[in-house]
Amino acid sequence: MKRFFLAYICLLLCVSGNLPAQSLEKNIEQRLTDYFINYQTSYANIGTCKLDHFTVDHEHKTLQVYANDNFGYQPFTEENTQAIYRSLKQLLPGPVNYYRITLYADGQPIENLIPNFLRKKGKDKERLYGKIEYKGDAWTQNISKPFKISQGLQDRHIAVWQSHGKFYKNDRNEWRWQRPRLFGTTEDLYTQSIVVPYLIPMLENAGAVVFTPRERDWQKNEVIVDNNTCTPGSRYFEKNYKKNVWKTTSQPGFAQKYLRYPDNYNPFRDGTARFISTLSKPEKAFAEWIPNIPETGKYTVYVSYQTLPQSVSDAKYLVFHKGGVTEFKVNQQMGGGTWVYLGTFEFDKGVNDYGMVVLSNESSQKGVVCADAVRFGGGMGNIIRGGNVSGVPRYLEGARYWGQWAGMPYEVYSKSQGENDYNDDINARSLMTNYLSGGSVFNPTEKGLKVPFELTFAMHSDAGFKTDDALVGSLGIYTTNFNDGKVNSGISRYASRDLTDMVLTGLQKDISSRFGIQWARRSMWNRNYSETRLPAVPSMILETLSHQNFADLKLGYEPEFKFTVARSVYKSILKYLAEMHHSNYTVQPLPVSHFAVTEEKKKNTFELRWIPTEDPLEPTAKAQGYVVYTRIGYGGFDNGTYVKGTSFTVKAEPGLVYSFKVTAVNKGGESFPSEILSAYKAKRSKGTVLIVNAFHRTSGPESMNNLMMQGFDIQSDPGLPYISTTAFCGYQQNFNRTKAGIETEDGLGYSGNELEGMQIAGNTFDYPFVHGKAIQTAGRYSFVSCSSETVESGSTDLSPYYMVDIIYGAENSTLSNRMQQALTNYCRGGGKLFISGSYIGNKLGD
């Protein structure tokens, strides 16, 4: 009995000894549960956070806390990470609040989720390129630019694409968009209206070589010039030099045997290519591609060649166009057997001496240059699926079909072997980049064309709607759970999270600052998406905004919003790659303002003047010089003249109309251009007319938003795009706001297809030329022009001019008080005033 009693006492003591520990862990669990349920952050909309589990080690005095996925959706900085740990220590009971606490989210301690660019110390070298660096010549270089870039994206190769595109739906035997027609657009069209006219030019202005797996040219015409077959009226020509003669390579090359192509047919296997040994002497032997251009306009120029064992890295191409001759160096040691983009140029209709491409055998290296087909213009879709082609311009199609036309292997553009075009198109964007980059320093484990792409960026828009006119905002996606957590160069896939964080942080800051709102930042998802899983390099998807939400698109249709988004993304990519390579960066300047062209006292000269634009968000984005581009008559713009200061004097030949635009440049690259101003000196001038361009407005389409109706009345007013846009699919048909979220004809925003493939004209910023040509035709009067900004600031005096011509265009606001006063004073002094515009009758002011 005594033994039994002693055993009972011992058992009781043991149980009572465990009670405090059990009670403590329950206490910890309850406090952590409450903390995460009530957790809120102003940084992002991340949904509901929860405690997943925790482990406590009293012996080693450690506490490991694991939060759910949502907690990892937010951005982490050194400041908010320290604040989170302070909060945990304050809420936890003793003695655990003195333990070493580690909080995990997204599979990492949260301090590891602080992007490298925000760390003052302790950089994660596993997600930096470090010594991994491409040191050769870029794939393509425009060497006619009158300035050099040293702290931009020079020699960087980036793959960028704009979401989806029209595709063949196998199970329904029809061509269709990948996303629904809503609010006058589709995702397939909308994101393209940011990527093509804004983002890609900004990256290229910073010096980057940009590849996009969808056709970038909105030109519906296409001309092929080749040594095998040519578009009718076009011509391929070769000139030999002594013993240096053009020969046929042993590899197959491009030939256009058909107008339409079935699946799994490669036009880059149907023809031949030519090669010749190089010489250091200039232009002794060359090949010429002379197109028969069907219609005057802008055309992209793509070249092609084969990469041969003796290929040189400085093949010299000359593009003759309406503005003159632009010279390129192409590294033929990479990227053979596909279309290689050089640039977009203006060409006159027909066959012209100033419309051709020339490849010289001049090189600083001993080897060979290779010549295959040259392509002018984007063209129409020509891939047959289900017995038919798409019937739309190629730029509207998905990447799968451009990949076939660009000579990609079948397994690259059709992983499903022709069974599922939808999946193939999604995969092709990444697989094309991998194929092009295979064998490069950034993708050494795959075979390919050795182009050193080091980043991919996919711009999408998302679904989702709000019924209270609130914003849905931006979401970022990356993938780490693939290939043992590494990209093909061996660095951590968490480098993609850094990129995603930088882009979302930049967007929230830039959009909020520019538009005076709080732009909605959503989550950062670490999920298994093809476009972030398959790329061999760091990659991200940006769901820019919701194409299903009126408030997002009302802002999203504004050209200024598109510019802001593109500039923000460009800046983030610039800073990200500078961090990855431990290099300095400079942000390219904003466009100049207060542009004016006046007559100089010296005979037959014009003075150009302007002022730089400060960027309050970017201290490095200061202009260090300028480039003045000149156009004569109906020609194109030349390659530009570098100017150090903010004025430039031009000698003019009487009888010719001169047009000018100015860009600002610095170590980081080149800004977007100014408005275009024109000037003319009559041979026997009776006086000078001043043309004042007051038409600077751009806007989205007309909108309506009341208790019952919501949407965009594109038919009434499509808005004023920057230059032009292809963003619209058709007119909105359903405006019933109670039907939000329905993606059929019964749903809010449902739209037609009347505008698909159309380029809607916008503000070209080139109207002084139009008015000036009329003045020239009238005879005996010269003219100069200026921005209305210079009249309002007082830097342009109206009194010396015989007449003032105010271009008010589609401006729908009242003339400013300063402008009204200047015009009043001019008229009171006997001046002659002509003013034109769409809203002049009710917008002149008091």
Walk through the language-model features, giving the residues of each.
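Pro/Thr/Ser/Gly-rich low-complexity, intrinsically disordered linker/stalk tracts
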Residues: 576-620, 654, 668-687
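A glycine-rich, often tryptophan-bearing local segment used as a flexible ligand/cofactor-contacting loop or short
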Residues: 797-799, 806-846
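Active-site-adjacent mobile loop/cap segments within catalytic or ligand-binding domains
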Residues: 272, 373-381, 461-483, 514-583
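Aromatic-Pro/Gly-enriched surface loop or interdomain linker
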Residues: 194, 198-206, 214, 386, ...
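Non-catalytic propeptide/linker segments at domain boundaries
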Residues: 66-68, 73-176, 357, 371-388, ...
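Short beta-strand-plus-loop segments that form exposed binding edges in beta-rich domains
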Residues: 357-368
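Beta-strand-rich modules
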Residues: 649-670
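Active-site microenvironments of hydrolase-like enzyme catalytic domains
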Residues: 161, 396-493, 525-548
